[in-house]
């Protein structure tokens, strides 16, 4: 095997995701896991769970992750990469601690981790690292030999992540009626987070209004707009907007909300909109409910034609990007200088989260960072 195709020192890859219910009886326990420590009563969890009950109590994220797991295994096998791929979740089965225990008993000692979150933020990165540290501490308490885990860098601007989204936007534009297509507006959506969390996202030097979270999304949106212009010859107007807000109404979150944005566009006479969920790797419940159900209903109410572009999901180009990220990090860990693939103005993200990156309100141990107790 070529040195640059060698996964060493890694002996396994962990696909780490959020998790979701697989049936109606799972919904409230799942939401209790998501909100643990906040003292939210069960009746309120049942209210929040209505989004899931509309879809039979099943989150689409699990099937999406199974498909991505299969795509990764196929890509690795097709390219002669003999590396097992496991899947674990933060909030539902297969639980992270159980999967790390399985990996440890299977003999794996150096594990690369791919989180299904492409951008910098507390909830999209450090919280995953905190959960990894909690699970490693649990294994240590059981007397098991604790493996080293390394989280692969943020991939928001990797060509294998961006290209499928470009194709999705182009397909959605082509699906619009011809008489409104050229005048369409592109609404790039991502999960809203508190403005304080956005401002503190990424390394300390990126902190400020919007932080790395907003800057990274804007960079991806510009990449897509440029690629669409190159393909169509049209400079489509666009904006980064937000969705899926939760929490107390008095706490500022990133705005505008997608539904408010659609109302504004309708009032301005915009003839059509493509909603592009660039903040989501796959069709989460936030995509199926907040965009396909709620935002689409709002657009119909005001007579605005909309299309929702596809997420990356298990696109073979994304699976290849994961392989590239893995081999890049492996070579770096072996002391090799390698090309780090990235598009846009921000360049490739860091391998090791520095101290102060995406800080938590209450400091907790986090794995796979410069401040990690597990190295």
Swiss-Prot record:
Pfam families hit by this protein: Ferrochelatase
Asked if the record carries the keyword Cell membrane, the reply is no
The top EC class is: lyase
Q: Which UniProt keywords apply?
A: Cytoplasm, Heme biosynthesis, Iron, Lyase, Metal-binding, Porphyrin biosynthesis
Function statement:
Involved in coproporphyrin-dependent heme b biosynthesis. Catalyzes the insertion of ferrous iron into coproporphyrin III to form Fe-coproporphyrin III.
Does the UniProt entry include the keyword Cytoplasm? yes
Q: Can you tell me which family this protein belongs to? A: Belongs to the ferrochelatase family.
What is this protein called in UniProt? Coproporphyrin III ferrochelatase
Q: Which domain of life is it from?
A: Bacteria
| Localization (cell) | Cytoplasm
Provide the binding site for Fe-coproporphyrin III.
59, 128
Q: Which reaction does it catalyse?
A: Fe-coproporphyrin III + 2 H(+) = coproporphyrin III + Fe(2+)
Q: Name one GO molecular function term.
A: ferrochelatase activity
Q: Its annotated pathway?
A: Porphyrin-containing compound metabolism; protoheme biosynthesis
- Where does the chain bind Fe(2+)? 191, 286
- What are the leading ranks of the lineage? Bacteria, Bacillati, Actinomycetota, Actinomycetes, Kitasatosporales
An example GO CC term for this entry is:
cytoplasm
State its Enzyme Commission number(s).
4.99.1.9
Name the encoding gene, please.
Answer: cpfC
**What biological process terms from GO does the record include?**
heme biosynthetic process
């Amino acid at each position: 095997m070529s040195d640059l195709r060698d996964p060493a020192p890694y002996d396994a890859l962990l696909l780490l995701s959020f998790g979701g219910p697989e049936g109606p009886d799972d919904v409230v326990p799942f939401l209790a896991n998501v909100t643990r420590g906040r003292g939210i009563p069960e009746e309120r969890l049942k209210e929040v769970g209505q989004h899931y009950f509309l879809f039979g109590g099943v989150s689409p994220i699990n099937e999406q992750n199974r498909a991505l797991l299969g795509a990764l295994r196929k890509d690795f096998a097709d390219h002669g990469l003999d590396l097992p791929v496991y899947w674990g979740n933060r909030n539902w089965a297969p639980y992270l601690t159980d999967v790390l225990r399985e990996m440890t008993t299977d003999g794996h000692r150096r594990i690369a981790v791919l989180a299904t979150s492409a951008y910098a933020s507390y909830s999209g990165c450090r919280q995953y690292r905190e959960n990894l540290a909690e699970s490693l501490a649990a294994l240590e308490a059981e007397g098991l030999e604790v493996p080293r885990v390394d989280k692969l860098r943020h991939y928001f601007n990797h060509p294998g992540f961006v290209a499928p989204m470009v194709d999705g936007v182009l397909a959605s534009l082509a699906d619009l009626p011809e008489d409104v297509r050229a005048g369409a507006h592109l609404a790039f959506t991502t999960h809203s987070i508190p403005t304080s969390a956005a401002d503190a996202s990424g390394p300390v030097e990126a902190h400020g209004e919007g932080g790395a979270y907003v800057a990274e999304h804007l960079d991806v949106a510009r990449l897509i707009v440029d690629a669409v212009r190159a393909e169509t010859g049209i400079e489509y107007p666009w904006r980064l907007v937000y969705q899926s807000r939760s929490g107390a109404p008095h706490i500022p979150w990133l705005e505008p909300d997608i539904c408010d944005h659609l109302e504004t566009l309708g009032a301005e006479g915009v003839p059509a909109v493509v909603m592009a969920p660039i903040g989501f790797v796959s069709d989460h419940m936030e995509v199926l409910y907040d965009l396909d159900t709620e935002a689409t209903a709002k657009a119909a109410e005001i007579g605005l034609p909309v299309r929702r572009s596809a997420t990356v999901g298990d696109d073979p180009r994304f699976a290849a990007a994961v392989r590239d990220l893995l081999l890049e990090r492996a070579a770096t860990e072996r002391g090799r200088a390698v090309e780090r693939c990235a598009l846009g103005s921000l360049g490739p993200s860091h391998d090791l989260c520095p101290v102060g990156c995406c800080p938590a309100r209450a400091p907790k141990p986090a794995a796979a960072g410069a401040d990690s107790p597990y190295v």
